Amino acid sequence: MDSLPTSQRAVVQSEDVGSFEISRGRPIPVPSSSQILIKVFAVALNHCDWKMPARVPCPGTVDGADYSGTIIALGDTAALTSGFKIGDRVAGAQMASQRRRPWVGAFTEYILEEADSAWLVPDSLSWEEAAAIGCAATSSVGMALWKSLNLPGTPQNPITEDGKYVLVYGGSSASGTFAIQLLRLSGYNVVTTCSPKNFGLVESYGAEKAFDYHSPTCGEDIRTYTGNTLEYALDIITEAKTIRHCYAAIGRGGGRYCGFELLPHDLIATMRRSVKAEWVNGLEMTGLEIDLPGGYYCKANPELHIWFADLIKQYSVLISQGKLRPHPIQINKGGLEKVIDGLGQMKRREISGKKMVYPLV
């Protein structure tokens, strides 16, 4: 700790809604007993990094979720119980955009993390690849699959029934390819949607069949392909059009739908009652109360954080075994200053089939 700089920089939300700026002179945090202090080596961008600040602005809060870096200090409990040590390479996700904890966010030089929320990076992964896995979207995927959709199969205990389908809408996204891999390991057949140019990409991660989301009959085509038996739909995109496509794809017996965004309840109210709809808010996995407006408020839920910590351990094993691999990455130079440019590119939908990663060291 003695050799650390006296201050650091961070990408924070500015006063202009949906905009960002570099904040300088920020203090280096000190870990509590259960925390580790990490020097950030690389960060990766998620759509939530620009969407949440636009929807629930919290000026001055640090932005960013996915990171990789090196442990440079541990709290007393973390040192005794986590299995980590100084110098370990770790990755994970910060649950940013929190009014009550404005310092939490990955787009900075040094971060605090709960020791049970980080995973050990194997030598087979680069800093950039580890950041691309992170855990922000990937943990939301886990929450969607096993909490909202309530799937019976897991990678550790896959289903044995043949021909059980799950739809991943938006399969060429980083969350999509991670979901496809988890579902295949859990024994499911995966159908997905993306642009035709990305059909090969999603198939390389395990999708059985890809459908063009531009097609007005996309949902009906999926329903036909799955023999009117589809029960589960995971919607990474979660817009009015994608919701309609997912509902159209689910078979006559109904099923479950899970979105990655706050659902438009007026639209859901007009849809089939035989489909149970939910959405996942990744901030819940902190286990803390999240004081945000507009449907994003979360009650404290320590049990969910315990579940999340166990999920991270399972991911860590699968990653070390090479059973889960990162999304294709696009490495961009320029550090934190260029992260702001990258967020603009994502907002303008200029990125497809790649995970934007920025080395900081």
Curated annotation (Swiss-Prot):
Ranges in a coiled coil: none
Entry's EC annotation: 1.-.-.-
Gene Ontology molecular function terms on file: nucleotide binding; oxidoreductase activity, acting on NAD(P)H
SUPFAM superfamilies: GroES-like (SSF50129), NAD(P)-binding Rossmann-fold domains (SSF51735)
Keywords from the named record: NADP, Nucleotide-binding, Oxidoreductase, Virulence
Cystines in this chain: none
Annotated ranges, domain Enoyl reductase (ER): 15-357
InterPro entries: ADH-like_C, ADH-like_N, GroES-like_sf, NAD(P)-bd_dom_sf, PKS_ER, Trans-enoyl_RdTase-like
Top-level taxonomic group: Eukaryota
Residues that coordinate or bind NADP(+): 48-51, 172-175, 195-198, 213, 260-261, 351-352
UniProt subunit comment: Monomer.
Family under the similarity heading: Belongs to the zinc-containing alcohol dehydrogenase family.
Function: Trans-enoyl reductasee; part of the gene cluster that mediates the biosynthesis of GKK1032, fungal natural products containing a macrocyclic para-cyclophane connected to a decahydrofluorene ring system that show potent antitumor activities. Within the pathway, the PKS-NRPS gkaA, with the help of the trans-enoyl reductase gkaC, synthesize the polyketide-tyrosyl acyl thioester product which can be reductively off-loaded by the terminal reductase (R) domain in gkaA.
Protein name: Trans-enoyl reductase gkaC
Species in which this protein is naturally found: Penicillium citrinum
Lineage: Eukaryota, Fungi, Dikarya, Ascomycota, Pezizomycotina
